[in-house]
Regions:
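C-terminal non-catalytic interaction/assembly regions of soluble proteins
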Residues: 37, 287-369
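Short, acidic/small-residue loops that bind anionic groups at enzyme active sites
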Residues: 140-171, 177-181, 303-312
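Bacterial N-terminal signal peptides
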Residues: 13-25
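Accessory alpha-helical/coil subdomains and C-terminal extensions
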Residues: 43, 49, 73, 79-84, ...
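Short Gly/Thr/Asp-enriched flexible loops that form oxyanion-binding sites at enzyme active sites
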Residues: 129-151, 290-299
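ATP/NTP phosphate-donor binding region
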Residues: 33-117, 296, 355
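N-terminal secretory signal peptides that target proteins for export/translocation
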Residues: 1-11
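Internal gly/pro-rich beta-alpha loop/helix module
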Residues: 156-227
Length: 369
């Protein structure tokens, strides 16, 4: 095992020397050499599902802005990373090629179905999903609630476009493949790997618009790290897991996020109701609070059977029940430590699974660990 990590460390060192990037795409000095050398036998089987994002972008190498997200295919991504064939038997499939601002429930469904299929057919030992960072935590959170597998599923992206100087995508993809291929990653649910760090989409959130260390865990911490010598998890894998929710084949219901602010009226809530939202998530001030006008409109929505969840626009901390807001009386659900975007995903899945009563929804929000 130690020899394998030493070999991987040496391969990491080759990246700087071998990797050359062009404005129109990726070229590597190592490609011809890799093609001629047969890969080692009995390697873990990794399926890369490509969805687009900055990691699959083209750009001017002199700039990290003005790039075209989703301009590179999954196969081109694999060809851009020397040494992948030494750690796993890897193939790529293209699920979509979009910036993650355009990620949607249809693509989530396609991802989940393909992952389930690959695992049920025993085609793979691990999955890597290349993805934009903007909504990566939402995709990961969704998949973590609908998949039931011990095999690693790892999301990876980049903050710098592929053609820029010192792009972070190739190393991130290499490390994601290492994590997906590692026996240590078994039974850990869906993971996110970027910038030498292993996170859970349950806890991680994007905190910076440009930094390569954008994913942080305000209410927890990372699951582990990847370095030149080893994959280092900070705790053992869980011995028990919550039951996966059914994957809704008919699409996800509409759940709107409304943003609280000073001088807030009821317009956002009323608009959500008028547009047939089945759920409303409040990105509230402080402990998930809002103006009296907004809270009154939310209570009226709850009386109509709409699922109403109080979250917060604050980056850390918990939204607790019945502190400033009378949740029991109003029929609201407290998100605890789930941010608005993850609260929305969970509410969508619960509603699609027929869970709509405030007490049952609240119980589900308390059981996401």
């Amino acid at each position: 095992m130690q020899e394998k990590h030493i070999q991987n460390a040496l391969m990491r060192g080759l990246h700087a020397a071998l990797m050359t990037l062009t404005i129109g795409g990726f070229t590597t000095a190592a490609n011809a050499q890799q093609a001629s050398a047969p890969p080692p036998q009995n390697l873990p089987r990794i399926l890369v599902l490509a969805t687009g994002g900055t990691i699959a972008s083209t750009s001017d190498p002199r700039s990290a802005i003005g790039y075209n997200a989703g301009g590179i295919t999954g196969d081109q991504l694999l060809a851009s990373v020397p040494g992948l064939d030494k750690i796993a038997s890897i193939k790529a499939e293209q699920i979509s090629n979009v910036g993650s601002q355009d990620m949607n429930g249809k693509i989530w469904y396609q991802l989940a179905i393909r992952i389930k299929q690959a695992i049920d057919r025993n085609e793979v030992d691990g999955i890597v999903i290349t993805h934009g960072t903007d909504t990566m935590e939402e995709t990961g959170f969704f998949l973590d609630h609908v998949l039931s597998t011990s095999k690693p599923v790892v999301l990876v992206g980049s903050m710098r476009p592929g053609g820029s100087t010192s792009a972070d995508g190739p190393m991130n993809l290499y490390e994601a493949a290492e994590v997906a291929a590692s026996p240590q990653s078994v039974n850990r649910g869906v993971l996110m790997v970027m910038n030498d760090t292993i996170n859970s989409p349950r806890w991680a959130t994007k905190t910076n618009t440009t930094s390569v260390q954008t994913f942080q865990n305000p209410n927890a911490g990372p699951l582990g790290y990847v370095d030149a010598a080893s994959i280092r998890y900070l705790s053992p894998a869980p011995t028990s897991h919550r039951k996966a929710l059914e994957l809704p084949s008919g699409g996800l219901p509409r759940v709107d996020i409304v943003y609280a602010h000073a001088d807030m009226d009821a317009t956002q809530i009323q608009d959500a109701v008028q547009h047939d939202a089945k759920g409303i998530v409040l990105a509230g001030v402080g402990d998930g609070n809002a103006s009296k006008a907004a809270l009154d409109a939310m209570e009226a929505a709850a009386r109509k059977g709409i699922v109403v969840v109080r979250s917060t626009r604050v980056s850390s901390g918990f939204v607790n029940r019945n502190v400033e807001v009378p949740d029991d009386k109003s029929g609201f659900v407290a998100s605890y430590d789930l941010n608005p975007q993850k609260s929305r995903v969970l509410a969508q899945l619960l509603i699609a699974n027929g869970v709509t009563s405030p007490d049952k929804v609240q119980k589900a929000f308390q059981s996401t660990y």
